[in-house]
């Protein structure tokens, strides 16, 4: 069956919408984004990860095997993406397992939340992603629609997520010192996107081991509840944000600190977050905080930059997306997950670019 890929631009935000059967859709996406995928593979600071994979080939292949067996759909998606882009599968696999090998993965991120219904995410990554990251909506046959901020070449699961079930989350990368031979964390996160509720998503994360570490700050449109889930190996910590302000950077706050290696930069950002004092918290305040106090610029020894900011009001269902150096895009969460370009265009008073 035929898959379709449509490229749009609303204001400063690129938005790719893919429809069709799973493997055909990912093959078409790979072909569409082939040049950007090659740019990413050529530009990633890969030597520490490559060295670790070569030193620990048994671990690398064990993580691959667990990913394939436990998350066959996501594994098939990555296989089709590589084939469509015309790049070696192992190159994409290594890129997607960067954070599962104990060598650091070159990503960061910050999540802020205010109970019961505000959730904000800064997507921090390597400069190679600047200008080629974009919104990606996946409309895979028989599955809920999913919208993410996408890094070309990566499974669409390691950044922030909005689904047609109203699930919303942002992910912070956490470097696990001694990974277990479990499935790659991108694969686990992709499986979680099929959940219909926060409780189901948490259950998926509890029941699926992850070699690397992720921290999820999640909620659901129309449901006044926020939770933070930290995941590494077979360990899971779930914290409900009952009231007030919550934050997370790139080290664990609930799981044992012996599991991860906290960078000085993550600790410094955490200190900034801990001293943020929202007087009248709303979506505008979250956008302001994320685009100023903890915004990163790949300078002064920091290798990463903030590529986008995404803030969701779970009460109203409105999402604000701010690409690096660009103006904000407003959208309803459901419209992003459904790929409703007309609705989002109308809300922003713009003409979509093809």
Where on the chain are the PLM-derived regions?
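C-terminal, well-structured catalytic/ligand-binding subdomain of enzymes
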Residues: 1-87, 98, 115-354
